[in-house]
Structure formats: C-alpha cells, structure tokens
Amino acid sequence: MSDWNPSLYLHFSAERSRPAVELLARVPLENVEYVADLGCGPGNSTALLHQRWPAARITGIDSSPAMIAEARSALPDCQFVEADIRNWQPEQALDLIFANASLQWLPDHYELFPHLVSLLNPQGVLAVQMPDNWLEPTHVLMREVAWEQNYPDRGREPLAGVHAYYDILSEAGCEVDIWRITYYHQMPSHQAIIDWVTATGLRPWLQDLTESEQQLFLTRYHQMLEEQYPLQENGQILLAFPRLFIVARRTE
C-alpha cells in the first residue's frame, strides 16, 4: 500500500463528492483566473471547479503519483502537479485555494493555514473541508486495534476545532464562514464501512503491515465495528460522518 488507490477511492465517489459540491456552493466568487485544488486526488473535485469556471487556470496538487495520473487522464484541460502541499508554491497569487478532504492529513495547522492565506490575492478565498471524525467509532477503533496488536499510532492528528480555526484565519486577515455537518451514509454491511475507510483513514495503519498482519487487523476491526454499528430495521447501517467546512476570504 505504498501509494493511494484511485479505484478504491472512487468506489464511493458520490458520497465523497457531495461535500465538495456543498463547499463550492458557498464560495463567494464569480470570476476567477487562478485556482489551486490542494489534494486533488483523482480529480473529482477539480472537475467541479472546471465546470464552474471553465476559463480559469486550474492546477491540481497531490503527492500521489497514481492519483495525479488518474486526474490528468480525466481532465486534460487542467494542470496537475505531483507535490507536497506544504512545499508547493504557485507561479502567481491565487483567487481560490480549494482543499476538499486533504488538509486533515497535514500537521501544524497553526502555521499551514496562514501560509495558504498568504498565497491568495486580495479578496481571494480559501475553501476547506475536512473530515472531523477522530472521535467517531470508525477511527477510535483503528487506534484500539493497533493498541491491542502492539502497533504504533499511525493515525492523523485531531482537528484544531472550530474556535481555533476561526481565530487562526481571523488573525491572518480573513472574514471566516465556518460550519459543521454530520452526514449519515447508508452502508449495506460492516465490510462496506471497511471498504470506505481502507481508501483513506485506515490506509496509514495498514501500509507497513504484512498481508497476514493486515488480515488480523481487519478481522478484529470488523468484529469491533459490529459491536458499535447496529443494523437498522431494513438491514442497512448508518455511518455518521462529521465534516468541518471553512470559507475564508482575505480582506488584508
């Protein structure tokens, strides 16, 4: 599991794209020229940006070679760069930085967010959506299984929180719109939950394990999911998935 798997990620493309659609709907810009899609993945969010601003110069950034290859194939009219978000520098100031479900993987948000604001034009917008599920059973159980099986903690850090992000971005000279939504995804089985998180949150826990170690981890994880996520009357499972949204417009 040395690289991200675009096919696995796109297995739940409708569910993953919905927050991007809702984030984009709140971006208060009509005409833009320069746009960056940070953590663009296979290009599903980039496609939304291109659809809204077909004449804009849109650059997708991702550290995964497989994701970049998939995005380039799907969107030949956009530019894609394989790079670390923290180190990438645009050639010109940006009108919009769009980051859908990517910045949660990066540390030091108290430094990262002001840095991103500094890349914007005056009145430019930083639009961010991040999964806020560190305390959800899906992610708590990952840590518990790792502890049981004597593996080091490989999960991402919890988000800084609504009040912290508001202060960070206000102090960086932005007007801030921030909100949190919990989606309830209908899952046909506990295995479907595993399929979902294997493409994202579970990936760091599995990537350095042998095949047999992965199987032991997933078997135990499946058992614990069954305890935490009961079936509905129709046999479906409701997977709660909170997400944090931020639209920050530069005013200084």
UniProtKB/Swiss-Prot annotation:
Its EC number is 2.1.1.144. Catalyzes the S-adenosylmethionine monomethyl esterification of trans-aconitate. Pfam families: Methyltransf_25. GO terms for cellular component: cytoplasm. This is Trans-aconitate 2-methyltransferase. Gene3D superfamilies: S-adenosyl-L-methionine-dependent methyltransferases, Vaccinia Virus protein VP39. It catalyses: trans-aconitate + S-adenosyl-L-methionine = (E)-3-(methoxycarbonyl)pent-2-enedioate + S-adenosyl-L-homocysteine. It is an enzyme of class 2 (transferase).
